[in-house]
A protein has these predicted regions:
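Accessory regions of macromolecular translocation/handling assemblies
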Residues: 1-19, 25-36, 46, 52, ...
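Major-groove recognition helix of helix-turn-helix-like DNA-binding domains
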Residues: 40-41
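Intrinsically disordered, low-complexity Pro/Gly/Ser/Thr-rich segments with frequent PxxP/GP/PP motifs
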Residues: 64-66
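Long, compositionally biased intrinsically disordered regions
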Residues: 57-60
Length: 547
C-alpha cells in the first residue's frame, strides 16, 4: 500500500494485521504522524476516517491512503484528442465546439506539445456541425506553424482540413490522435462491490472477447480487355473484280459489266473503313472503361489501407489507449490470454509502412496496377514488434527516451495480459535499478512460491542468479508468458550469460522435434536497453534506435 500524506509518504508491505487496527495505527506503524480520530482520509476514492478499522476498510492490494481521493479518468463522449506518440502520452481531451482547442509548445495551450520541433501555437482543433449530413466533424487548422502539421503524409493546407473519422496528426516529433467516440467501456472498479478477498484482491470478470480483426479481403485488380485489330485491307478483293470486269468488257463488248464490277471494291473499301472506325471507337471505350476501373481500384486500395491500419491498431494499441485501459479500468484490460494469437505483440511507434493488399489474381498485373502496389503506403500506422515466437526488442538511444519507450512496452505487457498468464521480471545494473522500482507494484512481478517476493534483481551477481533460475525452471512457471526486462550493458556479455540463454529460449522452442510440446512451451519476450547496437544480444528481433 502507499501513504501519500503531505508530511509522510512511502510504499509499504502489510504482512498481517488485526481487524481492530485503525488507519491511524497503520500510519503510526510506518513512522508517520499521530492523526486525530475524526480526521477525514481516503482509501483510493473511498472516504474513511483515521479511526476506521481495517476490517471496515478491507485493504486492497495497491491501496493508496491520502487526504484527497484518487481520481479516475472518465470517458469523453464525442470528439477527443490525445498525445499518442513521442516521449509523453496523455488521456483523451474533449474538443470543444465553442472555441478552437490549441495545441502547441506554450504552457498555456490546451494540449502542451513537449518538443522543440513544435511552434508556440501549432495547431487548432474545433468541432463543427455538418448541416448536409447532420454529423459532428473536426476542423483542423494550422495557424502558421514553422514545421507544419501532417495528415496522411500531406501538409495541412492554409484553408484547413475537416475530418469525420479517426485521424492521426504528425506535429513535429509528436503524434496526436483524434477519436469521434470513446473506444473503451469502463469495468467495475476494484472494491466497488463487496467481493474483496482476504488477500486484498477483487475478481475481474473478463467478458467474451470479440474475434480479432482479420486481414483485408483480397482486391480484384482491373485488367485490359483485348481489342482485336481490324483486318488489313485485302487488295485482291478490291483489284480482282476490276480485272474480271475489264476482261468481261473486252470479251462481251458490254460496258455495263464494268459498272457491276465496281460495286465489289467499293463495298470492300467501305467495310475496311468501317472496321477501322469501329476499332478506334472500341479502343477509346476500353481506355475509358479501364481508367474508371483503375479509379475504383484506387478506392478499394484506400479502403484496404484503412482496414489494415485499424487491424494494426487492434493488434497493437497506441500507448495512450493502453494507459486509458489500465486507469479506467476498461473491459479490455487483461483480455489477452496465454492462448491468444496476439500474445506478446507490442506497439513500438508510429510510422509509414510499405504495404499492399493481396490480389485475387496475383499473376501478371497490369503495369499501372503494379506501380500502385509498389508505391502504396500506410501513413501513420502502428509499428508492431511481434514476439509471439520469442525474441527481444532492443532499445538504443538517449537514456530518458529509451526509458520512456521501455516503460511503454512494459505497460503494454502488463495491461494486455493479466498476472495469471504473464510473468514480468526485471534485471538491471545497480546504477539503473532505481528506474525500475515502480514495477514492484505490478502483480505480474510476484513470485508464485512467495507472494512477498518479486522477480526483481539489481546488480550482475543477483541478476545472473535470478536469470539462471528462470531459465532452468521456466517450464514450471505458473504462466505461459514471460517478459524479461534487461537494463544493462554487462548482463548480456559472454557465451555463459544466462540472460542470453533466456532471451534465446524461443529459438530452442522452434527447434523442438515434438511439435505438441513446442505448442505448449513457454513464450519468452525480452526488452533490452543498451548503450549501443553492438551491445545488444543476437536474440533481438526488433531494434529501435532513438536519435
Amino acid at each position: 500500500f502507499c501513504l501519500d500524506l503531505e508530511e509522510h509518504n512511502g510504499s509499504y508491505e502489510l504482512d498481517s494485521w488485526q481487524p481492530e487496527t485503525t488507519i491511524a495505527d497503520l500510519i503510526q506503524a510506518t513512522g508517520g504522524p499521530s492523526l486525530p480520530a475524526d480526521e477525514p482520509l481516503y482509501c483510493d476514492n473511498r472516504p474513511v476516517t483515521a479511526s476506521s478499522t481495517l476490517a471496515e476498510v478491507k485493504p486492497m492490494e495497491g491501496m493508496r491512503i491520502s487526504r484527497a481521493p484518487l481520481s479516475y479518468p472518465s470517458l469523453v463522449q464525442g470528439w477527443s484528442v490525445c498525445l499518442s506518440g513521442g516521449s509523453t502520452v496523455t488521456l483523451p481531451h474533449p474538443i470543444p465546439s465553442s472555441r478552437p482547442l490549441v495545441a502547441g509548445r506554450s504552457p498555456y495551450a490546451d494540449i502542451v506539445l513537449p518538443t522543440a520541433s513544435a511552434s508556440w501555437e501549432h495547431l487548432h482543433l474545433q468541432v463543427v456541425h455538418d448541416e448536409s449530413t447532420n454529423t459532428q466533424k473536426v476542423r483542423i487548422t494550422d495557424p502558421g506553424s514553422t514545421n507544419g502539421s501532417f495528415v496522411d503524409g500531406q501538409k495541412i493546407p492554409e484553408e484547413g482540413l475537416t475530418v469525420s473519422e479517426s485521424t492521426t496528426i504528425h506535429v513535429g516529433d509528436c503524434v496526436l490522435t483524434l477519436q469521434p467516440a470513446p473506444q473503451e467501456k469502463a469495468a467495475p472498479r476494484p472494491g466497488s462491490a463487496p467481493n474483496v478477498s482476504t488477500s486484498g484482491t477483487a475478481p475481474f470478470n473478463r467478458p467474451p472477447r470479440q474475434g480479432a480483426l482479420s486481414a483485408p479481403d483480397k482486391v480484384e485488380a482491373p485488367t485490359r480487355k483485348n481489342v482485336s485489330d481490324p483486318p488489313k485491307f485485302n487488295i485482291a478483293m478490291a483489284v480482282g473484280p476490276i480485272i474480271m470486269a475489264a476482261a468481261m468488257v473486252a470479251i462481251m463488248q458490254e460496258i455495263r459489266y464494268a459498272l457491276f464490277a465496281m460495286l465489289s471494291p467499293i463495298l470492300s473499301i467501305g467495310m475496311w473503313v468501317e472496321q477501322k472506325r469501329r476499332h478506334a471507337k472500341d479502343k477509346v471505350k476500353e481506355r475509358v472503361r479501364f481508367e474508371q476501373e483503375m479509379e475504383k481500384f484506387k478506392e478499394r486500395i484506400a479502403l484496404s489501407n484503412r482496414e489494415e491500419i485499424e487491424r494494426l491498431h487492434d493488434l497493437a494499441p497506441a500507448p495512450d489507449a493502453v494507459q486509458l485501459r489500465a486507469l479506467l479500468p476498461a473491459m479490455t484490460l487483461w483480455r489477452r490470454r496465454s492462448t491468444s494469437p496476439d500474445l506478446l505483440t507490442f506497439h513500438v511507434g508510429t510510422g509509414h509502412i510499405h504495404w499492399a493488399p493481396e490480389l485475387t489474381k496475383p499473376s501478371n498485373p497490369e503495369p499501372e496496377v503494379q506501380h500502385i502496389l509498389e508505391h502504396n503506403t500506410l501513413w501513420d500506422a502502428p509499428l508492431v514488434a511481434d514476439l509471439r515466437e520469442g525474441g527481444a526488442i532492443g532499445i538504443v538511444g538517449p537514456r530518458e527516451q529509451s526509458l520512456a519507450l521501455a516503460r511503454s512496452l512494459v505497460l503494454q505487457a502488463a495491461t494486455h495480459t493479466g498476472p495469471a498468464d504473464m510473468t514480468i521480471a526485471v534485471c538491471a545494473d545497480s546504477a539503473r535499478s532505481q528506474d525500475w522500482v515502480w514495477m514492484s507494484w505490478l502483480p505480474h512481478m510476484h513470485m508464485a512460491q512467495n507472494q512477498q517476493m518479486r522477480w526483481f534483481a539489481s546488480g550482475k551477481e543477483q541478476s545472473d542468479q535470478m536469470l539462471r533460475s528462470l531459465y532452468n525452471d521456466i517450464e514450471s512457471l505458473p504462466t505461459r508468458g514471460l517478459c524479461v526486462v534487461v537494463d544493462s550493458d554487462t548482463l548480456t556479455e559472454g557465451r555463459e550469460s544466462p540472460a542470453r540463454d533466456l532471451l534465446a529460449y524461443g529459438d530452442e522452442v522452434r527447434l523442438m522435434a515434438n511439435k505438441t510440446a513446442a505448442a505448449g512451451a513457454r513464450r519468452v519476450a525480452g526488452i533490452v536497453l543498451a548503450s549501443s547496437v553492438d551491445r545488444l544480444p543476437a536474440s533481438c528481433t526488433s531494434i529501435v534506435e532513438i536519435g
